[in-house]
């Protein structure tokens, strides 16, 4: 019951200035081309090396969640472009520094 309540309880408003910006490198599945292939090519199939950049909104033992977009309207409290990556797939998390452009 506590787990269910946690899932349906609205999340507190997120302070985006306290959420780290990151670049994450992870391994992902790679689909092989269709048709007949030499067995050695199938056995040696590489994994895809992927990267994502965004806000690191979840970082625990099971997964990380990256959110690319954030609505700055305080009444909206929505994010977009998110991806959940199993923790075991993650190879590297690089923390990025946010700098503001000057005119």
Where are these regions (language model features)?
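Conserved RNA-binding domains used in RNP assembly and mRNA/RNA metabolism
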Residues: 10-103
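N-terminal amphipathic/basic-hydrophobic helices that include classical n-h-c signal peptides
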Residues: 1-10
């Amino acid at each position: 019951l506590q787990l269910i309540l946690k899932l349906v309880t609205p999340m507190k408003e997120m302070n985006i200035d306290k959420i780290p910006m990151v670049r994450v490198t992870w391994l992902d599945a790679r689909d092989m081309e269709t048709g007949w292939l030499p067995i050695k090519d199938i056995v040696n199939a590489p994994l895809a090396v992927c990267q994502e950049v965004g806000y690191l909104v979840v970082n625990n033992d099971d997964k990380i969640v990256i959110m690319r977009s954030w609505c700055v309207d305080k009444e909206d409290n929505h994010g977009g472009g998110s991806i959940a990556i199993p923790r075991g797939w993650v190879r590297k998390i690089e923390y990025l520094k946010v700098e503001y452009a000057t005119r």
